[in-house]
Amino acid sequence: MVDPASTQEQQAIGVLLQKVSNAMVALHKEQFGRGPTRAQSHFAGPDALLCVLEDTLLAAERRMVAMGEQQRVRESRMFLQVATADEFISTVETITGRTVRAFASAVDPDQNIVFENFAFEPDRRRDGDQAE
């Protein structure tokens, strides 16, 4: 028998992850002028979130990849992500209700995929009031 509480919790998590994915698409479009065509978000354990964004590169970046300049694409994306990190962090914190303690972005230019990674402060409600 399926536990209705567990099913409802899974549905709520699915809705939350969809909101994160939609927000990442919107942020990329706003910050970089183009949003990804596919986005998926997943919890990676209790205190981490991974967003996989596909088909994110700008036309000029795709041309750079064709020229063999993948490292330049990585470097320029890294600078852009550092400049916009606060927007990405605050958006995820608002949606999840969790405090982000670390954020990192990575790009695979050859596959045209960006990874947005968020590490949260431990959830004290889940962990109890255990001292560290």
Where are these regions (language model features)?
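Interaction-mediating elements
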Residues: M1-E132
